[in-house]
Amino acid sequence: MLLLVVGILAACNSENITLDNEKKNETETLKTGVIFTTDSPIADAKRQLIDIEAKGNGTQTRTSITHTPGQGADASWNSDDFIWVKNKNGEWKQSIGITLHHGGRRADFILPGSASDYANGCEVRYTGTSITYNGFTPTPSDISFPKVQSRTIANDFSKAGEWGDCGSGTARNMNSSGKFNFTLNHKAAYLCFLPRCENAALAPNVRLKKIKITATRGTNTNVLFFANRHNFDGENIYDMGHPILSPDITITLPDFPLYTSVSQEHNATYLVVAPDNYDFKIEYTIKDPTTNIETTFTNNITNITLDKGKIYDVTANLTPKSLNRKHYMWDALQHYWWGHESDMPIVDYTQGQNFPVSKANDPQRYSNYNFPGYNIRNDAQTEFFKTIPNVNEMFWYAYKGDPHWVTDNGTYEDRGHLIQVNMGGIWLKKKSKIMTDEGITEEQMRNGFPKISPTDWRTTMGTWPSNVIPSTNPVPNTTEYFYLPALGGFAGGLLYNFGSRGFYWTSNGAPYSLNNVYMLSFTSSLVQVGATSYSEGIIAKVFE
């Protein structure tokens, strides 16, 4: 089959290959007949990048492809490849032997009969063996893009002929010597999937299991027949309305690793498709073997033109949402489980070990709370806690932030692994949206609530507003709102309300209490500003 090998073959690129070395590198089939050779120089195969946000164009070559992203491609043949040549009687003849030169960069094919059987300028085709997937024997006019495919090696296109690769060319009789020369032009298009996972803790612990591509629109292709049997006329590829509906192709993979950046060597996966202008839905399935959790990422690419003989690099960032569970005692220098992350429980109402117990024993993780006296402003002193909302700002978020509750039974990253969590949370208006909608300045938002006769809650306890019931309708948009997950809290190392209730510190102690600090609290049925003990472990976060 035609070999699309990935990687640079140094010996093949040398311009100083001696005759002896050439002989050593030849793979020869001893048969008699007419020689059709591809001894023209390596052709340039253009490549293009298809990122999730981008689409491109490019150009291509003669035989098969040694592909390096960003550097085009080279060409090579394999020992089981064959070609078709049309003789003077209009009959297609299949080659009966092949001799490889220069590691496959050149090849001599043996055709049956004599040179006089073939016209100068006769047509040559390559169709591989893909049609056998549909139960047919290879012909010069049939190919297939198998609906179900598998790969055993990353960064390898050595079975392109089984996946639908095809091409054609014109053979010329060289100086009436009886030996014909041809250059093959590829007529299929090629996708090279290059996924990554940008979470450095998670990437080493997950594997790429499957890629599924669905054609949702095609300009010249009936996408119901995107896969399986197609007709090839030497120039164009046409779907044949195969009776099996097949708008998608699935590639199963043997646990390819993922890295934080593109790693062609370790996980590049190739696919052959019919040229056209498409909309694609591409689904990548990854698995964490430790937790046995799988998740699928879906990327949609629209209006992408795939031209004949061109390679398109398709990148994708397969990074799931992270819980980022950094609970703090109020005004602590470090988070609750700092240095003891592996002790942090994930199951609700279970207790972890090595939680902070006193300022003397855990000066980094324990609260810096000091009560200055009643009705005296008590601001956080650590640099991080100075950046989180103060209590007045939190009132605006809670009572004028138009909260929307959502529940996501989804997959998250937690401490370098995938976990399945039934996670609730709320969407709130961003500060800029609140100020615009309420007609207030940032200074007003910082110094009191409500707008009329405001109370500065840092020093005074005013009239508490009624709890807000969050909407369960979809959030109007995600550009003017931001999301807060319900990550629960810790008391004495015990996790509580994980996934069902959210607690977020403010930067102010409550002026009416010896040991309480203001916080935002929410569930599916209420949103409020309240207060809790400084020794609780809840989330501290800079709000948008």
Identify the residue ranges that each predicted region occupies.
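Sec-type signal peptide cleavage vicinity
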Residues: 1-399, 405-408, 422
